[in-house]
């Protein structure tokens, strides 16, 4: 019986994205350490790259950047994964950022490079619109 690695990898990528969003919403450094690989790099909206060495640095910076918008939580809308290899995939997501009262700040798209590192899948690199 042949194992379908594509379905397995797509499911792992989806679990990583869902776990990452839950970690952000819970402001959980420990969970971010599970779902992000460090050093972690993002290509920001202005095209510049930014890297963080720890989950604490990442979360603090994330919250500071979104404070002005009144960010409270993120709602995942769509996850679409393309398998690149048995150790890497590209995952496109769309999501909404919400204020505490549930009103939408905006809808965004991101591309994540999700890799297997030390037998654990996590987001190594991200690029997005917000």
Task: Describe these PLM feature segments.
Residues 36-37, 95-97, 127-128:
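Short beta-strand segments enriched in hydrophobic/aromatic residues
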Residues 1-30, 34, 38, 44:
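Short, low-complexity N-terminal intrinsically disordered segments enriched in polar/charged residues
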Residues 73, 85-95:
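A short hydrophobic beta-strand element
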Residues 81-89, 114-120:
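A short, structured loop/turn motif at beta-sheet edges
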Residues 29-79:
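A solvent-exposed, acidic/Ser-Thr-rich amphipathic alpha-helical stretch
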